[in-house]
Amino acid sequence: QVTDTNQKGFLYKTSIVETSRAILGVRVLVGLPIAAVAAFIGSIFNAILVPSPVAGDVLAFTVRMAVIGIFASTGGLIAWFNLFESKRGAVLVWIVAAAGGLLGALAGYYIGDRYIDHPDVYILNQRLSQAVLFGAALGANAMATLLAIAAARWGRKRVT
């Protein structure tokens, strides 16, 4: 844009789309490893306090996946906490990311269970745990990313 002053000057504006992509990239790059570490802490919490599921105990299995998802979303929230300008917005991001963490943990479990070669139970549990933790971290950040894209699309920076 050319300004109409004594001298011709150009105002340079950065594209909102390019800035948004860069910010999203940084948020995911920061949020993913922190969410993975937090999911690992959640698995330690599970080992201490949540009863181990027996075969067919869907409730205990779901609780363990939910705990890992909640821990992953809480860790990933470090990268996403200021997405909105209100406390309700931060809570919304956390809830959406927690749902994503739960879905990601479940997806990681079922994908890992199907495709991980398991010569013995110990190796299966190690690799399956890694798949669940990464799935929770990825799911939490993916849902937060979708929320950020939706908020940018609708021009919402404040959740009332």
Language model: regions and residue ranges:
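N-terminal signal-anchor transmembrane alpha-helix
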Residues: D4-I68
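Alpha-helical membrane-associated segments of multi-pass integral membrane proteins
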Residues: G25-R27, G31, F40-S43, Y115-T160
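Transmembrane alpha-helical segments of multi-pass membrane transport proteins and ion-pumping complexes
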Residues: A36-I44, A72-L77, G101-D113, A140-T145, ...
